[in-house]
Amino acid sequence: MPIDPVALTADLVRCPSVTPEEGGALDLIERILSGAGFDCTRVDRNGVPNLFARWGRKGANRTFGFNGHTDVVPVGDAAAWTRDPFGGEIADGWLWGRGATDMKSGVAAFVAAAVDFVQETPPDGAVVLTITGDEEGDSTDGTVALLDWMAAEGEAMSVCLVGEPTCPERLGEMMKIGRRGSMTAFFTARGVQGHSAYPHRAKNPVAALARLIDRLSSHDLDYGTEHFDASTLAVTTFDTGNPATNVIPALCRATVNIRFNDAHSGASLTRWLEEEAARVAADTGVEIALSAKISGESFLTPPGELSELVARAVEAETGLRPEPSTSGGTSDARFVRAHCPVVEFGLVGKTMHQVDERVEVAQIEPLKAIYLRILKDYFA
């Protein structure tokens, strides 16, 4: 009997799986997949829940993979929600709740498609699902743990589809063939405290750091590349912790976040930031220290067989040819890309992480149909 992806989405939304809690979501998926003949393994690391499921022979020449997550961000002020954030309520043509868009509907649609596919037309190959409970958190023990376990166990995917919401306005208009890299730079400026009436007796870390931030934010990192928009740098914090208006503080901190294309690497940008900080430090006499956190490098799955497979299926079901894009934030595709070619396609993501997150019910069944067509065409 075919699985209803709308009902499954609602059931998953009712699982309060705020990172790092599993909330019953992976248990539910495991029961469904096990009942359909998938070999399921829980790959939990450091208390983080993950699920690996495979239908078909281990080591098959053609193995289609799916990656997704069931963890969700916190609801915030629950009183601000129109409906219960974990109610999975369907009203006015929408399915409401935390994770409805990001990305329990995508997971439900692929689970439903995969079960229908292997039961109706068993493929000559394997279908693998890697579902994590650590995408919205630190992402260190989720998809990374699954891929580590797969490598150790001799499990593999030939290609992978990530079911993140990718469409800005209409189902079918966009897929992701890559992502920008992301890094955060933490600056600490240390000067000499003093009276604001005698600035010559102090070394002002606020002025020095402001100069550095101005240099960074006014610099064009690049003007875009063939498949990527221009890299961006955003100032996200600037703090002194100084309540006194007549005191030049001894310490000032600032943070910038850079989303970068394939013209750069995390290492090359770190070197640039260090050089800029050293210039300002030399000019002002203020010590400026940098600590950089690189969340992921940019990557691209060049347009080809996988992206064309996805595009054809999307166009057949929606009438829209999806634009291949690298825009937006990071996703777990940044980890999968080292394992196999990866493309992302999912629903419209306008309300993800918002109060009253919801997904249009009319999109969920077509998404299942797209995923089912992708599977059929891949193994044809």
From Swiss-Prot:
Pathway(s) it belongs to: Amino-acid biosynthesis; L-lysine biosynthesis via DAP pathway; LL-2,6-diaminopimelate from (S)-tetrahydrodipicolinate (succinylase route): step 3/3
EC number: 3.5.1.18
Organism field: Cereibacter sphaeroides (strain ATCC 17023 / DSM 158 / JCM 6121 / CCUG 31486 / LMG 2827 / NBRC 12203 / NCIMB 8253 / ATH 2.4.1.)
Enzyme class: hydrolase
Gene behind this protein: dapE
Protein name per UniProt: Succinyl-diaminopimelate desuccinylase
The entry's keywords: Amino-acid biosynthesis, Cobalt, Diaminopimelate biosynthesis, Hydrolase, Lysine biosynthesis, Metal-binding, Zinc
Active site: 71, 135
Cofactor binding, per record: Binds 2 Zn(2+) or Co(2+) ions per subunit.
InterPro entries: ArgE/DapE_CS (IPR001261), Bact_exopeptidase_dim_dom (IPR036264), DapE_proteobac (IPR005941), Peptidase_M20 (IPR002933), Peptidase_M20_dimer (IPR011650), Peptidase_M20A (IPR050072)
Cofactor: Zn(2+); Co(2+)
Highest taxon, organism lineage: Bacteria
SUPFAM superfamilies assigned: Bacterial exopeptidase dimerisation domain, Zn-dependent exopeptidases
